[in-house]
Structure formats: structure tokens, C-alpha cells
Amino acid sequence: MIFVTGTDTGIGKTYVSAILGKILKEKGINVGYMKPVESGGIEDTAYVRSELGLNNSFEELNPVNLKKPLSPNISAKIEEKEIDILKIKAAFEKLKEEYEFLIVEGAGGVAVPIKKDFLIADLIKYLDLTCIVVSRPNLGTINHTILTVDFLRKKGITVLGVIINCITDVSKVPYYEETFKSIEEFGNVEIIGIVNDKKDFYIDLKKLNLP
């Protein structure tokens, strides 16, 4: 099992989750997916559900769904909903029993609040998962990636590596190789994958504690 988090919203966690899931399926692994909390509709869950051909209901895969495209704590407040962490845990345990390998995707970045005194990073810790961090290749990513990795480690969470999702064409990013080296050197973390698109990617599966 693995938790897919990222340096920001819109960084490509859903896209990378789907690609990773399809790779594992092609290797004969019975892989499932879960997005514990989704704000702004059901689009992310629906996309990965479709890509992986999962038969689970949306509620099973996404136990907390909020309509407003805001931080979960704010969206829940506006919608007058109480986010039940035990409900998330129960859904997680059920899917964990059903699948050989489970990909759990976060919402936004690691410091996004789910509810009072409970961040995305706290959810990763609560579910006792290791994680990968999805990042971008362009200017600013060194800072964002290192801060994210450091925050997770201070919470006692193991970071297996970073996957660069090229939301900007990497060939148009000046000195991107030096950027990636800096992430690894100063963040003391390995870049285990680079995703250009659905057909052009590399992910080092040996780093993911596969069954």
C-alpha cells in the first residue's frame, strides 16, 4: 500500500495514481484505489476508477465527498458536514482486504486541513502508510518539494521517493537536470520517477514495497 501526496493542488496526483495503478495491473497485481477526501465533486475518483476498471462504488472509493472546490475543512464547514475519520478508516480497511495493493490519494498538499487539528499528513500517519510525493519540474519545485518531504518526515512518515509529473514540458525547463539533482541532494530524497505523459514515463517500482 502507498499514499500518493504532492507539493500542491493540481500537481498531478490523480494522473500519477492512475498510471501507477495501470502499471501494477499489467504486472498481474490486484490493485485498488481510494481517495479518502475529495472536494469539488467526484472527478478525481471517477477518473482513476475508470482508468483501472474498478467496480467499487464511488462511496467506497471516496467516503468523504464535498461539493465546494475548497480545502476540506472549509468546504465541510460551508456544507455543514462533519468529516468522520472513523468512516475513512473503515472504508480503508475494507479496501485493504479486497486488494493486493492499494493506492491512496490525498487532497492537495500535506498540510491541507481535513478538520480541526487533523491535516492530510495526519491522515497518512493515522492509516500507517508510507508515501510518494508528486512534484513538478519547473522553477520553485526545489523549495516546495524539500519542504513537503521535510514536513512528512517530521510527522514520522516514510517518504519512498519523489515522482516528477511534467505539467510543464520538461524540455522547456532550463537546467531541469540540475533542479532534479538539487532536490535529491538537499532533500536527501530520491527521484524515483518522471512522468511526461501516459505513454512516456518511468517509475522505479522496486522502491514501492510491492507484494
Curated annotation (Swiss-Prot):
Keywords: ATP-binding, Biotin biosynthesis, Cytoplasm, Ligase, Magnesium, Metal-binding, Nucleotide-binding. InterPro entries: DTB_synth_BioD (IPR004472), P-loop_NTPase (IPR027417). Its cofactor is Mg(2+). Mg(2+) binds at T14, D44, E105. GO terms for cellular component: cytosol. GO terms for molecular function: ATP binding; dethiobiotin synthase activity; magnesium ion binding. The keyword rRNA-binding does not apply. Substrate binds at S39. Pathway: Cofactor biosynthesis; biotin biosynthesis; biotin from 7,8-diaminononanoate: step 1/2. Homodimer. Catalyzes a mechanistically unusual reaction, the ATP-dependent insertion of CO2 between the N7 and N8 nitrogen atoms of 7,8-diaminopelargonic acid (DAPA, also called 7,8-diammoniononanoate) to form a ureido ring. Belongs to the dethiobiotin synthetase family. This is ATP-dependent dethiobiotin synthetase BioD. It comes from Methanococcus vannielii (strain ATCC 35089 / DSM 1224 / JCM 13029 / OCM 148 / SB).
